[in-house]
């Protein structure tokens, strides 16, 4: 059974972060991670042709695929120390620090805010920095 479906409360923020990161690493399709009406807001200039604010899993998957095509070997990971603010027993906001490494191009760090409802991400705000920052301890 899906660990998020079993425990969609404050106990499971790392599971959401893991699925979100796996999606960016193309280990899970966006259709298994985000809701049909999920919007993703990026806080940086586009690096690939993409919608300004992708809507739903199909558009988000297209963004992920375009990035992976342009930057082969790109790898995302997140800091295991996440922050969680519940709205209810089945929804809340997760804050995570992440970094992305591109072979031959170094590492960048970012912050994502993920809103979830049940087992799906319903909204995301993603900010990428130009410098690598240390993870929180």
Tell where the protein language model's regions lie, with residue ranges.
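C-terminal and inter-domain tail/linker signature
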Residues: 1-137
